[in-house]
From Swiss-Prot:
The active site is at residues 25, 58. The keyword RNA-binding does not apply. Belongs to the PanD family. Heterooctamer of four alpha and four beta subunits. One of its GO terms (cellular component) is cytosol. Its EC number is 4.1.1.11. This is Aspartate 1-decarboxylase. Is synthesized initially as an inactive proenzyme, which is activated by self-cleavage at a specific serine bond to produce a beta-subunit with a hydroxyl group at its C-terminus and an alpha-subunit with a pyruvoyl group at its N-terminus. Substrate binds at residues 57, 73-75. Binds 1 pyruvoyl group covalently per subunit. Pfam families: Asp_decarbox (PF02261). It is found in: Cytoplasm. It comes from Cellvibrio japonicus (strain Ueda107). GO terms for molecular function: aspartate 1-decarboxylase activity.
Length: 126
């Protein structure tokens, strides 16, 4: 049996563009895509921390080092420039693969620069 698990996420990315009439998808700085171990055309879930919207789309590459996070096509209606979003990818893993699986977590600053990376989320306590 396969388990559907978090593979990677870009945490608190800042939306830099929203292009309604561009081909649909989410353009992400190619350096951030590579650092997170994501891939061009991979399906992503986007969680808009600023307004609560949650939706699916896929990755297209934006200029490396640009800090670009651009929601395009229908996704542009789900965000405003400046919104903070979490961009997540998931994968299917066997029980054997899960023994060593750790997600790649990339935490971003206000300018979509890398603050830090991790492979664990601290346990939430009351």
């Amino acid at each position: 049996m396969l388990s559907h698990m978090l593979k990677a996420k870009l945490h608190m990315a800042k939306v830099t563009q929203a292009e309604l009439w561009y081909d649909g998808s989410c353009a992400i700085d190619a350096d951030l895509v590579a650092l997170a171990g994501m891939r061009e055309f991979e399906q992503i879930d986007i969680y808009n921390v600023s307004n609560g919207e949650r939706f699916h789309t896929y990755i297209i590459l934006a200029e490396p080092g640009s800090g670009t996070i651009s929601m395009n096509g229908a996704a542009a209606r789900k965000v405003a420039v400046g919104d903070r979003v979490i961009i997540a990818t998931y994968g299917h893993f066997t029980e054997a693969e899960l023994l060593n699986h750790k997600p790649k977590l990339v935490y971003l600053n206000e300018n979509n620069g890398v603050e830090r990376t991790s492979n664990a989320i601290p346990m939430q306590v009351a």
